[in-house]
């Protein structure tokens, strides 16, 4: 499969740029409300020809919910499938990503999947480490290895902004603690989770994450298996069924690749055995996905025949 050319990417960005006017920033996290809604960037990392990029592709933004894929992989490495899925389910939910409804109405009471906030918080609570500093360093080092970027760090400003306003996430934690899903100190867990979500990347970093998952955990440039194949399979399956919030079904039909979005405007996707895609567009649709990012992936998938279906 040929890699998309830079000029083609530039043309596609111009084509979808008007969609940014239809979206809104994630202002409920104060720091994210400072983004420029007109920013739009993309990078594609191919297994053989490195990467092409266009637009705001080197601008830093925070992973937010994209980090859920990273911590799921780490938790599976740390604890194994049996333990992880005794605490968190495998099913999609039709509710918003920060909803408490299914925790109250499902028996046994456990988060339906690792891509909603309740599930992601439970996953983060499973990570091994003596304290939060050790745990966040493990997460950062994992991201650094996948991206081949040793400078990756988190934004303390964004993490603090999230920590100060994360009332609903705290309530999810207390409810799960009541039901034996987590046993961590809630404020310590919230501190780690907000730092995890505030890890900063650009489109090129994100595309390289996509490439590693596209290659079943293998880094074709380092010629090294970074993540076990069976773990990437689990992660990619959740990306298909739950990765794009309440738009996951429509995304599967219109784009048809494993992908995960975050409310800072990032989306990463993977084309099996070929390439990873990283997108940044902070103007979001009503489901919390980059509105222009969704559209450019739809156009690229139709043009290049990416859909797995």
From Swiss-Prot:
It catalyses: L-glutamine + H2O = L-glutamate + NH4(+). Keywords: Hydrolase. Its EC number is 3.5.1.2. Substrate binds at residues 65, 117, 162, 169, 193, 245, 263. InterPro entries: Beta-lactam/transpept-like, Glutaminase. GO terms for molecular function: glutaminase activity. Homotetramer. This is Glutaminase. The gene is glsA.
């Amino acid at each position: 499969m040929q890699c998309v050319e830079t000029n083609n990417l530039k043309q596609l960005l111009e084509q979808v740029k008007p969609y940014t006017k239809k979206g809104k920033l994630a202002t409920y996290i104060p720091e994210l409300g400072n983004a420029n809604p007109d920013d739009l960037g993309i990078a594609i990392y191919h297994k053989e020809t490195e990467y092409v990029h266009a637009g705001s592709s080197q601008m830093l933004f925070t992973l937010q919910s994209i980090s859920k894929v990273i911590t799921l992989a780490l938790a599976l490495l740390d604890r194994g499938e049996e333990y992880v899925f005794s605490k968190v389910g495998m099913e999609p939910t039709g509710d918003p990503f920060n909803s408490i409804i299914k925790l109250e109405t499902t028996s046994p009471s456990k988060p339906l999947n690792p891509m909603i906030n309740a599930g992601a918080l439970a996953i983060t609570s499973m990570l091994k480490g003596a304290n939060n500093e050790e745990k966040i360093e493990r997460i950062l080092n994992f991201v650094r290895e996948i991206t081949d970027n040793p400078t990756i760090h988190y934004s303390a400003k964004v993490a603090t902004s999230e920590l100060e306003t994360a009332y609903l996430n705290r309530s999810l934690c207390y409810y799960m603690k009541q039901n034996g899903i987590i046993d961590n100190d809630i404020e310590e867990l919230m501190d780690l989770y907000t730092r995890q979500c505030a890890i900063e990347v650009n489109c090129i970093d994100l595309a390289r994450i996509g490439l590693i998952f596209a290659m079943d955990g293998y880094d074709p440039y380092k010629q090294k298996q970074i993540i076990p194949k069976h773990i990437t399979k689990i992660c990619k399956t959740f990306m298909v069924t739950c990765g794009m919030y309440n738009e996951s079904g429509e995304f599967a039909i219109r784009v048809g690749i494993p992908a995960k979005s975050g409310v800072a405007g990032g989306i990463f996707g993977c084309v099996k055995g070929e390439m990873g895609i990283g997108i940044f567009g902070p103007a979001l649709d009503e489901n919390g996905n980059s509105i222009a990012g969704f559209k450019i992936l739809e156009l690229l998938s139709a043009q290049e025949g990416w859909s797995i279906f």
